[in-house]
Amino acid sequence: KNVEFDVGERLFVVGPNAAGKSNLLDIFRFLSDIAGQGGGLAFAIKRRGGLAKVRSLFARNNARGRLVVDVKLRDGEDTWRYRLSVKGERGGQNRPVVDEELVTKNDREILRRPDDRDRKDEVLLTQTHLEQIASNQRFRPIADYFDRVQYFHLVPQIIRDPSRTLVANDDPFGSDFIVQMNATAPRTRDAWLRRMREALRAAVPGFDSLSIELDPAGKPHLIAGYKNWRSAPSKQNEADFSDGTLRLIGLLWAIIKMPANPGVLLLEEPELSLNSAIVKILPSVLAQARRSSDLQIILSTHAPEILNDEGISPDEVLLLRVTDDGSRAELLSSLPDASDLDLGLTISDVVDDLIAPDDLTGLFKAARSRR
């Protein structure tokens, strides 16, 4: 219903099932959908099924029925603030409209809406100034920052589907993943594939090569070569890859293609289908990527291997806990239980104690039941 948290270079989001981890990541995707090319407020709300689906089930009349996002950003010596409040339009259309849009730079107000123009023509409130190039010139760094948000949650079954004919642009689940790779400038793509190939040789037994080839219909495919008893490596395409190999390829691509200028990479449970040895080094791999591209990384996880990385501190772990009035978000470092780390407990041990359901006997009863 209401969450407030700081984001540093990295943030690891943990919590039980249905605590809101995906929804928390979606805050950043929502702002990216507004600021991004071809997006906007109406697009961002519609993509999520309407304003009623975006607001918390526990919200009731919280914030007078408004959806409110309030973000503070540091850019060198400058501090920006962007606040957006959205409500449903009164009347038949019930379109999402801007209730408030505020921008400040170093506490100096740059924009406040509604203004006189909005009051004279209320249709203007169906769009934010954030999404309009002609209107966001004075706070373009905010729009650029949100536009660089990238989300990764590759679904191998979607990539393998041979019947796919229509793909969604920038689909985080992978329907256009190989198309995106193929559309990259050849020299850049080949350089990135070489970097990925070296990583995959270390992580996947027998892996030898990775390339993109077009079939007779012009559709691009990932082609991997695997060493075997023959002199030439055997070739497989994405339909033959394991879930883990596909997700690892996607994860490497997401990391390598991030721009050098600051941005945000959102990863949802990146450990899925990956070997525990690979999962264990993911924080180090991501830390290396952050050093080379100056990005913030926010990921949700259930993996103790990730949380127990020696480089992770309690102020990088955001804990979501379910209450009778919605989920509560707190940094692990702010909780008294963090002192258990000084006694030798690992971060995953402390987190498990805080988020584990009180009673799981219902699961055993369900497994034992017979009709």
Each PLM stretch: what is its role?
Residues 281-371:
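C-terminal lobe/lid and adjacent interdomain/linker elements of RecA-like ASCE P-loop ATPase modules
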Residues 8-11, 261-263:
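Pre-Walker A (Motif I) flank of P-loop NTPase domains
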Residues 15-18, 269-276, 306:
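ABC ATPase nucleotide-binding domain "signature" loop
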